[in-house]
């Protein structure tokens, strides 16, 4: 524990630093242009460098210092991209940089340039751009206006030099997005002021608009605070705009470039930075009384004046098009400052059917903007007035997080940790408000449970992704995001049992933050290209350090959904899982965390458990607790980060397979005793009816209870919304495997009955079975445990959601389909063998046919231990086979992709297939340790 005196000293130091930050902000704010600390971008600087002006009849480059900035910024490999992970930045910056080099090489005007140097640079840049465009994954790009900016920039290169025509693997996807936008574009609407957001990217409209008709939309000389858009306007309008020139000159000297020629992508950003900085500090625990100063008063007055002047609707700076992000942030910030600010404008101008939009006609909604909108509503004293808006925003956010594969993405910040901590903050606040009795009846228990699942997953996965040095991605700002994320987890009752590793994670993160003296600029924020802000980064670091110091939590959140009433049972299951070879190397707290996650899921699963098949003669087994745990533990242990929805679907599927097993043994088997051929026919009828949508329910669902139950079960699988989106091939394969799975259960009942008659002799050996062990375990036996059926259900989910052009086959090539089948079959055989080792005594007692009953074992030994050892050896053989097949499958999937998007998605599908295999493997390992099947009572097995 940190001594109280030391903690007080730390907090005093943080307060002093926060006050210093506020002072510097105000002192660097201009009365006319405002404030902005966003980093310079090569792309915008390139456009400024392209501006020419005639002075006394002579054409000059107007901003040669920007040309020199471009030269100084080029990397050794020819690109303009210091951060090699920022793929699109490299593409757009390099296109823009190359265009500048070509223009100045062709027409140096008043400058003396080294042509040999320029030629060398152009050659390097051209080669580098070929590679960048070859590797660019268009599907992952969501930068502002990229779909119209990139084609325009590539056209400008070709106009400059016809040889600069580049191949682009993602050109089809890019063209599709561009046409979707430009088909709706009408210049007249822009001239009428109805497409104001386009004034931020006027450079993309060269040749499409009359720039004289947009001149009146400048604000203090700028076009939507964009140097690149302003430069394009200045060089294209027929009348020179002195105010626009003055704006660009001021931006060069007063922005973060400080006269170097570099300019930011957006300048100024007064309201954006003021509200983000103040709201972040206050949320972390800083009090306005602690930061009270003339400078804080000045910032407050600026925001109050803006809120009143624009009726609560603001943009990133004065006069700029309002957006939901800045409008929501000013509401939250003013309320934190004790200045009441309503949120009505958010409803009137940004609310749409399912969410809150940032701007009119936006292509994709913003996750973080909806977090900020929800926060603004929750900061209202009369939250009930905004209950419908709160429900709408919360539902949208939860749905996005529930379906987010691996991580949540957002258009305004590239780090998923940013969106994750915003989500955790606002949803924890929402849970606290509902548990305090407010917003009564607004939210369903199901939605709140999903919120709890996603909050817990988000926080836990952040803990699991922490680097050994205490950082996240060796990034100061991202580490601050993560700490803000985890300090919020302190408020959640789910984290009580793992509070020690939680605090350790926070402590290690803080240690990393305090060891960095001069942090490099980080480009996590996104506009046309990525940018950063030293002031924003400093704010998040201060906020993280202050939040980490605020350890007292009075009322834990989440108790209405999660009750810690099964801790003893949980500890036993954690102990069981920790003994398995797959999980024994993990720290025990990780398994405890996976168990907590599973227990939250269990609340959802319990409601759905009996919806498919009724099984009145079955006592519930431990699988009700184990099923969710198998999926969460394997997802977390391998850091797979499967989406909450994917895990949910597979958990529900696992429940379904156990229900089928119990239904067949406890209901269908006894009902069709002596008439199993008829039961096989009913299965075919149920599958056929599910396929044939033209038949009426009355034609299919006769009075036979078993028939209607089986039909309901088949439709439960085939009518799944995601399954219905899968490719025809994947759906048909699933249908075949479902039919085989159900038939295998009937055959198993028949085999059990046949074996039951032999069992009366007291022998543990099977003498009359019609097949060898190998054939049985590779067909009926492995089909019976649902391995192939579940595998192809999972492939339907993956093909429908994670292919480049859904619905595509999960395994698009014949070699992949074959290797997938081999992986699945060998995996299922291994699991069946493990299962039979673990359930040998129960199976023999209850008359269930087991691998160990086959003559291959009885003819060599009668000792159970020796039989099990022999079967384990065979299981290990099957393990080698499926591991080898899976390895080959993964190679085929990744290397067989024809474009970057397909390769990325194939790699992700392979990762999730690997998780599926691990779960199946884990079930087998658990069976070896302990039989988890339910007890079937009062079942007669001696019929035919």
From Swiss-Prot:
- Which GO BP terms sit in this record? diterpenoid biosynthetic process; geranylgeranyl diphosphate metabolic process; terpene biosynthetic process
User: Which molecular-function annotations from GO does this UniProt entry contain?
Assistant: aphidicolan-16 beta-ol synthase activity; magnesium ion binding; syn-copalyl diphosphate synthase activity; terpene synthase activity
Q: Which UniProt keywords apply?
A: Isomerase, Lyase, Magnesium, Metal-binding
Cite the InterPro entries for this sequence: Ent-kaurene_synthase_fun (IPR017057), Isoprenoid_synthase_dom_sf (IPR008949), Terpene_synthase-like (IPR050148), Terpenoid_cyclase/PrenylTrfase (IPR008930)
Q: Where is this motif: DXDD motif?
A: 323-326
Q: Which residues bind Mg(2+) 3?
A: 835-836, 839, 843
Its annotated pathway?
Mycotoxin biosynthesis
Q: What is its EC number?
A: 4.2.3.42, 5.5.1.14
Q: Which SUPFAM superfamilies does the protein's record reference?
A: Terpenoid cyclases/Protein prenyltransferases (SSF48239)
Catalytic activity annotated for this protein?
9alpha-copalyl diphosphate + H2O = aphidicolan-16beta-ol + diphosphate; (2E,6E,10E)-geranylgeranyl diphosphate = 9alpha-copalyl diphosphate
User: Binding positions for Mg(2+) 2?
Assistant: 661, 665
Q: Which cofactor does it need?
A: Mg(2+)
Q: Where is this motif: DEXXE motif?
A: 661-665
Function, please?
Aphidicolan-16-beta-ol synthase; part of the gene cluster that mediates the biosynthesis of aphidicolin, a specific inhibitor of eukaryotic DNA synthesis and DNA polymerase alpha. The geranylgeranyl pyrophosphate synthase GGS is required for supplying a sufficient amount of geranylgeranyl diphosphate (GGDP), the general precursor of diterpenes. The diterpene synthase ACS then catalyzes the conversion of geranylgeranyl diphosphate to aphidicolan-16-beta-ol via the intermediate syn-copalyldiphosphate (syn-CDP).
**Remaining remarks:** Part of a gene cluster that groups the genes involved in aphidicolin biosynthesis.
Q: What is known of its domains?
A: The DXDD and DEXXE motifs are important for the catalytic activity.
What name does this protein carry?
A: Aphidicolan-16-beta-ol synthase
Q: Which organism is it from?
A: Neocamarosporium betae (Beet black rot fungus)
From which lineage does this chain's organism come? Answer: Eukaryota, Fungi, Dikarya, Ascomycota, Pezizomycotina
Name of the gene encoding the protein in the UniProt record: ACS
